[in-house]
């Protein structure tokens, strides 16, 4: 089971998770980020920095509730950083609240820390290793197992405080189930990988949600115990603070933050560090800076003070197991990634638009530190070419510039002060301007009537295909004005329709002349018809008179 999951619909392509992932164990495909399980060290930085909360820690609350339904006692191992997360709430108040949820008991993981630090002291006194690296932090263990396998011999083969404590609980309560509660994502993986010691892991956030749903309020009750020095464990240098540090052979040092730890491991790899006991913590500030703490409760100074005030001056009184009972074996975790050849990297860089060294900006906007690192990620299928912001910007600008340059329509871009910000060649031609410098930065009133622009700006209603005559340029244009509210810009598109208008006028003239000729022909024909009718009328009258006279003459005879 993966400890970190993803809300697919929430990813917004900001690449922040890649940028903050120290080992770049995130694959990006189809506008979606995916965590690569066999490369991830579970530091939780992607969970912390994701602005969309697209990364989720797998919630084991239901699993714990199932454990509570059994007849076996379920005992909590509570990480010592709880005092920083739950301000003013001591172990007794936490124990009472946890019992209300159904737990049999709750103990401090610091008990296990005392066991572990004592074993470290034995190692320092009896071990022949040049360097000893603490193995309390599971993320650091994974970092060494996956990325620095040559340094595995230096990793202390000792159980973590969580494991040592839960193992001690099961020694005292053979039928017990153990649940660790802390600020860490990696502990969920550690519990799963090393089966039979820790039965479930909850984060402080999961516990807080459970308290709220159950209606349990924590009593602000602090307590103190002189025998509780191991409560310092969740702070940077906390392990060393509990150790004797009396072996002159070793230099004792504490390193926190994955980047710093990686730098130290590289120095060890290169033979630059010797005779050291190194406390390593993946989180800045150690466990009080864990992902759940950093995400929801980031107050490093205040948290350290809370831990320091809660910790005692002496060790917990515990039964120290034999060393063999505390042994933990670490093996190399293979990642199986073959590096690309130089030719393959160059070919990918060319596809990214990086044809020469000066093109490699190494801006980091894609999440990778260098363009070459990004090219290698593309080769391994972890990244896409489209993730390069300068590449996309250049591509978009080239595309838009080609459109602006080559469109036959005039384009003018104005700000809200009606000042010309951009103008293309077609618009220059319409307005008889020689170059953009003749008008850029000046008011549009110099070349066009601003009335339509003001109307669009004031009403917010765009104007489309308004035909007008520009008398000063003796040209007809169809003008469209669009107001971009987001960028506060006015976009004017002018189509020169002078030729169309000339053709239209010519056609109108021809039509008018044709109508006039037709009217003249009709008039002439009507006159001819009228003349013919008049002549026919006179002839008919004369004929009638003649016939009448002929009729009368015949009748008289």
Go through the PLM ranges and name each one.
Residues 395-429:
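Sensory modules in modular signal-transduction proteins
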Residues 58-336, 340-349, 369-376:
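Iron-sulfur-associated redox domains of electron-transfer enzymes in respiratory
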Residues 509-557:
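Signal-transducing coiled-coil/dimerization helices and immediately adjacent hinge/linker segments
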Residues 483-528:
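Sensory coupling linkers of modular signal transduction proteins
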Residues 385-406, 503-510, 521:
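Short, charged amphipathic alpha-helical "coupling" segments at sensory-output junctions
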Residues 449-499:
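PAS-family sensory/regulatory modules and their coupling/dimerization elements
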Residues 3-8, 12-36, 41, 45-61, ...:
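Iron-sulfur cluster-binding cysteine motifs and their immediate structural context
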Residues 427-439:
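PAS/PAS-like sensory domain cap-loop motif
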């Amino acid at each position: 089971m993966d400890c970190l999951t993803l809300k697919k619909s929430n990813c917004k392509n900001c690449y922040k998770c890649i940028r903050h992932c120290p080992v770049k164990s995130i694959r990006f495909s189809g506008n979606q980020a995916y965590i690569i399980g066999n490369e991830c060290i579970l530091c939780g930085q992607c969970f912390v920095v994701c602005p969309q909360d697209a990364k989720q820690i797998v919630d084991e609350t239901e699993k714990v509730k199932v454990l509570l339904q059994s007849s076996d006692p379920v005992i909590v191992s509570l990480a010592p950083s709880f005092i920083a997360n739950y301000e003013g709430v001591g172990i007794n108040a936490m124990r009472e609240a946890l019992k209300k949820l159904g737990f049999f008991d709750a103990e401090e993981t610091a008990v296990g820390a005392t066991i572990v630090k004592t074993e470290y002291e034995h190692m320092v006194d009896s071990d022949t290793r040049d360097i000893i690296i603490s193995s309390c932090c599971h993320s650091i263990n994974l970092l060494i197992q996956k990325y620095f396998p040559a340094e595995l011999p230096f990793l202390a083969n000792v159980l973590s405080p969580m494991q040592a404590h839960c193992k001690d609980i099961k020694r005292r309560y053979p039928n017990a189930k153990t649940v660790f509660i802390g600020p860490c994502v990696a502990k969920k993986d550690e519990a799963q990988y090393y089966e039979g010691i820790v039965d479930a892991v909850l984060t402080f956030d999961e516990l807080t949600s459970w308290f709220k749903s159950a209606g349990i309020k924590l009593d602000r009750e602090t307590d103190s115990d002189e025998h509780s020095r191991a409560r310092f464990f969740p702070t940077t240098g906390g392990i060393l603070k509990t150790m004797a540090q009396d072996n002159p052979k070793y230099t004792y040092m504490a390193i926190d933050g994955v980047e710093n730890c990686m730098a130290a491991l590289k120095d060890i790899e290169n033979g630059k560090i010797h005779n050291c006991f190194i406390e390593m913590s993946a989180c800045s500030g150690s466990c009080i800076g864990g992902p759940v703490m950093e995400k929801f409760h980031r107050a490093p100074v205040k948290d350290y003070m809370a831990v320091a005030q809660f910790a005692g001056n002496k060790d917990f009184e515990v039964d120290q197991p034999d060393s063999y009972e505390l042994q933990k074996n670490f093996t190399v975790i293979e990642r199986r990634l073959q590096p690309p050849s130089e030719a393959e990297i160059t070919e990918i860089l060319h596809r990214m638009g990086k044809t020469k060294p000066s093109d490699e900006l190494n801006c980091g906007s894609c999440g990778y530190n260098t363009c070459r690192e990004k090219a290698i990620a593309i080769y391994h299928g972890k990244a896409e070419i489209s993730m390069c912001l300068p590449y996309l910007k250049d591509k978009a600008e080239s595309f838009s510039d080609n459109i602006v340059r080559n469109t036959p329509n005039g384009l003018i871009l104005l700000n809200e002060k009606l000042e010309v910000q951009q103008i293309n060649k077609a618009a220059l031609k319409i307005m008889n301007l020689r170059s953009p410098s003749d008008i850029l930065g000046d008011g549009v009133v110099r070349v066009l009537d601003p009335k339509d622009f003001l109307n669009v700006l004031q009403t917010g209603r765009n104007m489309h295909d308004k035909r007008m005559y520009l008398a000063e340029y003796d040209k007809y244009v169809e003008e469209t004005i669009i107001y971009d509210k987001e960028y506060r810009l006015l976009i004017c598109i002018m189509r020169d329709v002078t030729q169309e208008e000339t053709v239209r006028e010519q056609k109108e003239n021809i039509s008018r002349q044709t109508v006039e000729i037709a009217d003249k022909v009709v008039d002439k024909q009507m006159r001819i018809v009228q003349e013919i009718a008049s002549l026919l009328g006179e002839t008919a009258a004369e004929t009638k008179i003649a016939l009448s006279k002929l009729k009368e003459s015949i009748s008289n005879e």
